[in-house]
Curated annotation (Swiss-Prot):
The lineage of its organism: Bacteria, Pseudomonadati, Pseudomonadota, Gammaproteobacteria, Vibrionales. Pfam families: KOW, ribosomal_L24. One of two assembly initiator proteins, it binds directly to the 5'-end of the 23S rRNA, where it nucleates assembly of the 50S subunit. Belongs to the universal ribosomal protein uL24 family. Part of the 50S ribosomal subunit. This is Large ribosomal subunit protein uL24. One of its GO terms (biological process) is translation. One of its GO terms (cellular component) is ribosome.
Length: 105
């Protein structure tokens, strides 16, 4: 199945503690999860690794969020939107279901 949410897409969170927040997708995982910039921040207890120059301490980082809890953000309408696929000039492209505009990559 083709990916409806891809890296660098602007998404809006639909459910969870960060509901309503927008961010850019930094990574799409094969497990059906995405990592979004500035969303779902968790505190990780980092162990120091002197050989690599890594300091220890409590580090805040983004955790994965299920792809079903985010939707692509349509800048033209200012709302969350759904994605469809169609062929244009022999290429499979994504488009917004609400207004039919092609999603830029």
């Amino acid at each position: 199945m083709a990916a409806k949410i891809r890296r660098n897409d602007e998404v809006i969170v639909l459910a969870g503690k960060d509901k309503g927040k927008k961010g850019k997708v930094t990574k799409v995982l094969a497990t059906g999860k995405v990592i979004v910039e500035g969303i779902n921040l968790v505190k990780k207890h980092q162990k120091p690794v002197p050989a690599l120059g890594i300091q220890g301490g409590i580090v805040e980082q983004e955790a994965a969020i299920d792809v079903s809890n985010v939707a692509i953000f349509n800048a033209a309408t200012g709302k969350a939107d759904r994605i469809g696929f169609r062929f244009e000039d022999g290429q499979k492209v994504r488009f917004f279901k609400s207004n039919g505009e092609t999603v830029s990559n």
